[in-house]
Structures are given as structure tokens and as C-alpha cells.
From Swiss-Prot:
One GO MF term attached to the UniProt entry: ATP binding
Annotated protein name in UniProt: Protein nucleotidyltransferase YdiU
NCBIfam families cross-referenced by the UniProt entry: PRK00029.1
Enzyme Commission no: 2.7.7.-, 2.7.7.108
Native species: Albidiferax ferrireducens (strain ATCC BAA-621 / DSM 15236 / T118) (Rhodoferax ferrireducens)
Cofactor(s) named in the record: Mg(2+); Mn(2+)
């Protein structure tokens, strides 16, 4: 695929590049350069991600970097490529997919750098290879928000806009997000080679992932020297821990297809996601998900289903189905334990133990049922509860409920439980566990509308708050307030 940058001098931005994925062989990818994005301009930049890459702030502010991250000038040392994968989408085999609008530049400092929205690839299918400003801002902000929350995630270095028109449901404008992760390998990469009976390539891919990210699988005693069963177990455990974090913070991914599942247990592919406003366990955030397959409360089971698909893909290497089943069982152990631990921390129960388990579980189950019945704002409840000690007026928490008697009864039981914990310690734990700020849909929408008018101040403000969501940030309380009535009318779909 020919692009206009092929004869330009490559720019050196001071990063040492390699591309170990490119060494796997041509079966895994197509080499190609990103398409130029006309007249690009900065929309948002993460200095935190830049530091992770070893990229100086002077480069992050430079017009030269703007050009290389939008395909207008090649970057010295990179080996750009688009990878092929397959997968299950909404429960059905979708066949060959692949990086339809993302180009992997390579890796630097152990981190892969990928440009999303960088033009057509052989895997674009019916797409145009571009991403729009709207979805790019959402991905940029949510990547950094999840990092701030301590949830495993891909990162975003920057989002760059252009006035180039892009047609979706309406005509929008183009953008490119620079994404960063140790690897962007998905369950779907394994499914692709397994489905096509390319077992040699499947083994090459599995060995690459094990040697680079899971070397302990080579010495697994549990699976009698079978590193592929050990890999499945390790991925299952990481995925379980990740989904537990999602459920605890109230994050709904929206499109948990197998090609959107990271082999490293990272949150990737931010599309029609949402942080819950009112606590509705059955909430469906993706307007395209008509049957509610990816509802909030279904995420744990869907993740297991996706892991089962990964297990099937790895079966030619694992050999025995019993070993694969045993490896998957770890998910059923790790997820509930991790979720319970996180929820006890949200309650400030730092002394939770077997002796308190019955009381603690009842407290947790009862408050979740009450929150759901009353449709209480999930983030605000937990943050207010964090400020509600034994000797503190609980009125701000009571005000969230219509059924005050039910709230009072629960708060009494809760305060009695906290009497066994040194005063102040529970609140300290809770304030570090229950964020004040999350990326609510309406906040993202306000930033997007301002950015369309070339006002990027809302993007900058949200980035600042979301990078440290547990801090109070005096003067910014409006960003932690209840969503306005119009927020419920926002519809987010797979269109991006």
C-alpha cells in the first residue's frame, strides 16, 4: 500500500525502536505505513504516558512529533504493520478480522506504540480505516482514567484531530489516537491460527507470548511441564482480576468480543463503554447491543465464555481437554475472591477475615440490593460513604435514598461493624478505593462538543482530574456531581 510519506526523511525522536512482533513472520501481519492525516492539530496529550515511553516533554510539544504520529512523516527505527486476527463477535464466529484501522509502529522501552485511525489496511473490510474525533477523545480519556483508577489498561499518549471529513451516521471529522501497551495481542490472534489449522503459527505465537510475558509458565509444576495449559491459567487469572476491578468501580465495557480481549489481561478497545451513573446491574451501555449480551452484570460470565474460546484455540497445543478445563477453573476461583476483596475495601473493612465473613458478606449483598432497588448513583454513594465515619453525621448518605428507614437500618449495622476498626483507618482506605471522579458519559460528551469548536480545555481538565481520581481537587466539584437529566439520553454505539 503506497502512501505519500514513503520518500520523506525519517524523523528521530530519541526513542530506541524494535518490533519483536514483526519477527514472527509474514503470516501474522502485513507491513504498511500509516496514511497521512491532513492538517493535524493537537487535541490532548498525556505527559504521564510520555514519561512511560521515555519521550521528553519537549518532543511531546513539538510539531515534528505531530507529523510522525499522523502518518505525515515516518519515524526513524519503526517497522509499521497491521496484524491479522479473527474472533467471536456478539457470540458468533466473525471470521477474519485484524487491525482494520490501526498500525503498530513497533516497541520502545518494552511498550508497543500503535496508531488508531491511521488509514486502510488489508483487514479494513468495509471500513474506511479512519477514526472520528468523538470516539478518539473518549478512548484517550478513558485509557488514562483507568490508569488513574489502578485498573490494568492500554494507555494513550495523545489524540490528534483533523478537519478531514469522515462519514458515519453523519459527517464527522477524523482523528488518530496513539495507543501504548506492552502488547496488543488479543484472544482473536490465537483463534485465527487455530481456526485455520495453522498449528505451527499458533505455537510460534504462544511461545512468543510465553517467553515475553509469561516465562513462569515454562516451569509450571501444576501442569506437568505443559506451558500452554499454564498460559491459559495465567491469562484466566489476569482476566478474572481485571473483570473484578471493572465490576467494583462500575465500568461497563460494552463490546466484549473475543477480539477485544487482551492476552495480558488489559482493558483495551474503548468504544461504547460507560461508568455507571445510577446503579442498575442490568445496564446495557452499547446502543448496538440490542439483546443485552454485554450488560454490566453479564461481564463476568462473558469474560469466562471468551476464555473458553481461547482455551479451544489453544487446545491443539495443550493436547488434553481436561488440562484446558482445569486451567479455566482458576477464573471461577480468582474472580469472586478478587471482587469480594475489592468490595470489602470499598466498605473500609480492612480487617475482613473468615471470622467476619458472614457479617461482611451480608452487609455487601444488602447494600448492593438497596442501591439497585433505589437506583442510587454508584460513584457518589461510595464516595459519600467514605466520608461517613462512626461518629460522623450520615445525612449525606441518607439523602441518596427514598427509603430512609432501609438506609438507616443498613447504616446502623455498618457503623456497628466499623466499631471494630480503629477510627480513621477505614476512611483512609475508602478514600483511596472509592474515586471522586470517573469519566461519566456526559462529561465526555461536553468535552467532545467543545473540542469540535477547537476548545480543548475540557479535555485537559478531565485528563487532570481523571489521572488522580481519588484526590479532592477543590474547585472542581461540579465534575463529581450528579449527571444532568439530559445525560440519560446519550446513546453510545459501536460507531467510531
Amino acid at each position: 500500500m503506497t502512501v505519500a510519506t514513503q520518500n520523506l526523511t525519517a524523523l528521530d525522536v530519541g526513542l530506541a525502536w524494535r518490533n519483536s512482533f514483526a519477527q514472527l513472520g509474514k503470516s501474522f501481519y502485513t507491513p504498511l505505513a500509516p496514511w497521512p492525516l491532513p492538517a493535524p492539530y493537537w487535541v490532548g496529550r498525556s505527559t504521564s504516558t510520555a514519561r512511560e515511553l521515555g519521550l521528553s516533554e519537549s518532543w511531546l510539544d513539538s510539531p515534528e512529533l505531530l507529523q510522525v504520529l499522523t502518518g505525515n512523516q515516518p519515524m526513524a527505527g519503526t517497522q509499521p504493520l497491521a496484524s491479522v486476527y479473527s474472533g467471536h463477535q456478539f457470540g458468533q464466529w466473525a471470521g477474519q478480522l485484524g487491525d482494520g484501522r490501526a498500525i503498530l509502529l513497533g516497541e520502545t522501552g518494552g511498550l508497543e506504540v500503535q496508531l488508531k485511525g491511521s488509514g486502510l489496511t488489508p483487514y479494513s473490510r468495509m471500513g474506511d480505516g479512519r477514526a472520528v474525533l468523538r470516539s478518539s477523545i473518549r478512548e484517550f480519556l478513558c485509557s488514562e482514567a483507568m490508569q488513574g483508577l489502578g485498573i490494568a489498561t492500554s494507555r494513550a499518549l495523545c489524540v490528534v484531530g483533523s478537519d478531514a471529513p469522515i462519514r458515519r451516521e453523519t459527517v464527522e471529522t477524523a482523528a488518530v489516537v496513539t495507543r501504548v501497551a506492552p502488547s496488543f495481542i488479543r484472544f482473536g490472534h490465537f483463534e485465527h491460527f487455530s481456526h485455520h489449522d495453522q498449528h505451527a503459527q499458533l505455537k510460534v505465537l504462544a511461545d512468543y507470548v510465553i517467553d515475553r510475558f509469561y516465562p513462569e509458565c515454562r516451569a509450571s509444576d501444576k501442569f506437568a511441564g505443559n506451558p500452554y495449559a499454564a498460559l491459559l491459567e495465567a491469562v484466566s487469572e489476569r482476566t478474572a482480576a481485571l473483570v473484578a476491578q471493572w465490576q467494583a468501580v462500575g465500568f461497563c465495557h460494552g463490546v466484549l468480543n473475543t477480539d477485544n480481549m487482551s492476552i495480558l489481561g488489559l482493558t483495551i478497545d474503548y468504544g461504547p463503554f460507560q461508568f455507571l451513573d445510577a446503579f442498575n446491574p442490568g445496564h446495557v451501555c452499547n446502543h448496538s447491543d440490542q439483546e443485552g449480551r454485554y450488560a454490566f452484570d453479564k461481564q463476568p460470565n462473558i469474560a469466562y465464555w471468551n476464555l473458553f474460546c481461547l482455551g479451544q484455540a489453544l487446545l491443539p497445543l495443550i493436547g488434553e481437554q481436561e488440562l484446558a478445563i482445569a486451567a479455566l477453573e482458576s477464573y471461577k476461583t480468582v474472580f469472586p475472591a478478587a471482587f469480594e476483596r475489592l468490595m470489602f475495601a470499598k466498605l473500609g473493612l480492612l480487617d475482613a477475615s473468615d471470622s467476619t465473613a458472614t457479617v461482611d458478606r451480608a452487609l455487601l449483598q444488602d447494600i448492593l440490593q438497596l442501591l439497585a432497588r433505589e437506583q442510587v448513583d454508584y460513584t457518589i454513594f461510595w464516595r459519600r460513604l467514605s466520608h461517613c465515619g462512626v461518629a460522623t453525621d450520615a445525612q449525606t448518605v441518607r439523602d441518596l435514598f427514598v427509603d430512609r428507614s432501609a438506609a438507616d437500618a443498613w447504616l446502623l449495622r455498618y457503623s456497628e461493624r466499623l466499631e471494630h476498626i480503629p477510627q480513621g483507618l477505614a476512611a483512609d482506605l475508602m478514600l483511596k478505593t472509592n474515586p471522586k471522579f470517573v469519566l461519566r458519559n456526559y462529561l465526555g460528551e461536553q468535552a467532545i462538543q467543545a473540542a469540535k469548536l477547537k476548545d480543548f480545555s475540557q479535555v485537559e481538565t478531565l485528563l487532570m482530574l481523571l489521572e488522580s481520581p481519588f484526590e479532592e481537587h477543590p474547585g472542581f466539584d461540579k465534575y463529581a456531581d450528579f449527571p444532568p437529566d439530559w445525560a440519560s439520553s446519550i446513546e453510545i454505539s459501536c460507531s467510531s
